[in-house]
Amino acid sequence: MQTKNKQGVLLVNLGTPDEPTAPAVKRFLSQFLHDHRVVDMTRWLWCPILHGVILPIRSPKVAKLYESVWMEEGSPLMVYSKRQAKKLAQHLDMPVELGMTYGNPSLQSGFEALIAQGVEEVIVLPLYPQYSGTTTAAVSDGITKAFKQLPVMPAFSFIRDYHDHPMYIEALAHSVRQYWEEHGKGDYLLCSYHGIPKRYADNGDIYPQHCEATTRLLGEALGLSSDQIGMAYQSRFGREEWLQPYTDKTLETITSKGVKKIDIMTPAFSSDCLETLEEIAGENKEIFMEAGGEQFHYIPCLNDDDMHIDMMAELVRSKL
């Protein structure tokens, strides 16, 4: 049944393996780590390392990590992404489809699903609040590739970022206040963002400035002083220097500054996933507690919270 409304939304996130198995993880990581936006090493140097060392060794290990956070309905990121798309479609009364930069459903399949519903103009909403070439620009690259496979290219608009949007900041602040009401307030609120190599920022990627702005605005919304809130970067790999301070190193040392009860959130992640549920709520909790911490509280991502959906709807309306 074709829609009378010729506009639709493509909700985009990074993606996830189809299942928590070594072969599925290997397929996903191969696609992800082949992207020059993610790893910009010369291909003749990088590909032998990727296929000869990283994928054979990392895939089984990462599969076990995925298995530890896998939900009955599937991967956490996919479960929450589907819920977001369903709620946003109901909120806007227009077609909304998912498209992942890597894995399934692909960006191409997302466009095809919208076109099949009669959509002629697509609003693309990458769920990356803070812009980075490694994420947002990779979506743009993927769209270009997808259009090559479509018989007719739809008109489209692209929401680049929303790191300082008032509704995004308030949704974050509300989630913190709500968590504090239920669990109590810690000594310090740490905002952990996915890291990128420092070299990328040195070459002009504006990601760290966006992360800093989000943290500052969130602190203002919560009425926190600079010694009550801070930020760090997680998920680094390889030997190259990444953006600092590092989340794990911060958690190792912050107890010596009198912080025994910490609250940690991940504002750059729109949905809970391996990096939030296993790396932060699992691994990094252990680091903090072993360093002398007494209480570690992970504040979940916005996921399919109503205020998060309201914000998405407002972003889409700005393009209608």
UniProtKB/Swiss-Prot annotation:
One of its GO terms (biological process) is heme biosynthetic process. It comes from the Bacteria. One of its GO terms (cellular component) is cytoplasm. Keywords: Cytoplasm, Heme biosynthesis, Iron, Lyase, Metal-binding, Porphyrin biosynthesis. Fe cation binds at H194, E275. It is found in: Cytoplasm. Its EC number is 4.98.1.1. It catalyses: heme b + 2 H(+) = protoporphyrin IX + Fe(2+). It is an enzyme of class 4 (lyase). One of its GO terms (molecular function) is ferrochelatase activity. Pathway: Porphyrin-containing compound metabolism; protoheme biosynthesis; protoheme from protoporphyrin-IX: step 1/1. Catalyzes the ferrous insertion into protoporphyrin IX. Belongs to the ferrochelatase family. This is Ferrochelatase. It comes from Vibrio parahaemolyticus serotype O3:K6 (strain RIMD 2210633).
